[in-house]
Amino acid sequence: CIRDRDTPIDFDNLLAEGSMMGSGGMIVMDEDDCMVSVSRFYLDFTVEESCGKCTPCRIGNKRLLEMLNKITEGRGTMKDLDALSTLGKVIKDTALCGLGQTSPNPVLSTLNNFYDEYVEHVRDKTCRAKQCKALLTYTINPELCIGCHLCFKHCPADAILGDVRKPHVINPDKCIKCGMCMARCKFKAINVV
């Protein structure tokens, strides 16, 4: 992760930022991307691609992934953030190959550059980018809902309650957070928090 737009794009500068150059690709992200989820995505790839020869890569990356899954599912703790950093550094220093040594980079660089997003996931149980489903809550604004029943009819979990021509509500215990209701609402009465 490179937070500063003015960072020169060369091997040494990227390495100093905790990133790397080699594949010739670069991904630009904005506030609609969850950095915790992005680091989880890259770590998931690493876990799948690991040859399994060395313990830091084989076991360590699985533990990192488990912690990231906990965090994106709203079950993470502040201790997990410390453990991510500590374990990531151990893997980086002790893995035997280039894949293993660079595998914790997405976690370490997002922790370094976007620590506040990790804290929001853990303490506030929120994802500012609205990417982590477990941390989302769908609500219906009663002032905008006219009770057209479109969301009610299309909810696959039967989580929407309400009579025709009266404001509806979403039962958060039944809601599977699929977004179908929001996609169907023509009155923009459904919000994600």
Describe these PLM feature segments.
Residues C1-I2, V193:
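Extended hydrophobic/Leu-rich segments
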Residues S50-K53, L144, K174, R184:
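Short pre-active-site segment immediately N-terminal to redox-active cysteine/selenocysteine motifs
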Residues Y138-L144, I170:
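N-terminal pre-triad scaffold of radical SAM enzymes
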Residues R3-T137:
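Redox cofactor-anchoring modules in respiratory/redox and cofactor-processing assemblies
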Residues S39, C51, G88, S103, ...:
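Small-side-chain structural scaffolding
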Residues P56-K62, I140, L150-P167, M180-V193:
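Iron-sulfur cluster-binding cysteine motifs and their immediate structural context
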